[in-house]
């Protein structure tokens, strides 16, 4: 009898907790003009200590899948893949590091150099040169501005849910894509979803304000020594 009573109490407590969390107060974004919601989302993202970004982008017609952790004022790190060629990326300040799979190095450096670079990191500038375009992915403000900078006319479709989270949906009339922004609490971006991820990419944002330790790899090879 005591066990049964305890179980009932636990279930009741969980139900109460669940009801409380589902009633989170609206942040008012559902009633704002679409462009203002975008502005608020970018501002919120810029003020966050950290974020996880996963999904895909399209660069020069080529899809790039990614899973990155970005830490404000530090840099970012994570894994990416382009045309099936996997590589890891780290940026710390103005330094960038990349480590490709054997297939990646063979594709971009040739078989001879690839054998020398097996399981090695390359080091270069994050501001200029071969790695600059990649390292912009580890700056949340630049990533969002790039992703949202070319949108068409946006329409605020109001409050809805996305994967169980209360969000505001902004629809791009020209592409059919949708930007989801949190409808409760701080208006962080939640996801950018395109009708054709292969052509336009789709991104998910999460773990806002969570930070991770990002450290430089030891023994990195200077990209300049390879002519990069």
What are the functions of these language-model segments?
Residues 1-10:
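N-terminal export and membrane-targeting signals
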Residues 3-4, 20-228:
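Subset-of-secretome marker
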């Amino acid at each position: 009898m005591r066990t049964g009573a305890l179980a009932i109490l636990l279930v009741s407590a969980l139900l109460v907790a669940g009801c409380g969390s589902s009633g989170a107060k609206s942040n008012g974004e559902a009633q704002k003009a679409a462009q203002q919601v975008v502005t608020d989302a970018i501002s919120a993202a810029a003020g966050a200590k950290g974020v996880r970004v996963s999904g895909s982008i399209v660069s020069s017609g080529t899809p790039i899948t990614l899973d990155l952790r970005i830490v404000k004022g530090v840099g970012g790190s994570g894994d990416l893949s382009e045309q099936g060629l996997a590589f890891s990326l780290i940026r710390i300040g103005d330094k960038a590091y990349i480590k490709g799979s054997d297939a990646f190095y063979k594709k971009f450096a040739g078989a001879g150099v690839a054998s020398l670079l097996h399981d090695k990191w390359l080091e270069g500038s994050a501001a200029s040169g071969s790695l600059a375009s990649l390292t912009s992915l580890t700056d949340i403000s630049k990533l969002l501005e790039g992703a949202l900078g070319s949108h068409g006319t946006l329409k605020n479709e109001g409050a809805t849910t996305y994967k169980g989270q209360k969000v505001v949906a902004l629809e791009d009339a020209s592409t059919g894509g949708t930007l989801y922004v949190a409808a409760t609490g701080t208006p962080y971006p939640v996801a950018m979803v395109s009708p054709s991820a292969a052509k336009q990419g789709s991104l998910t944002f999460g773990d806002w304000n969570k930070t991770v330790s990002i450290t430089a790899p030891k023994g990195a090879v200077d990209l300049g020594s390879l002519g990069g």
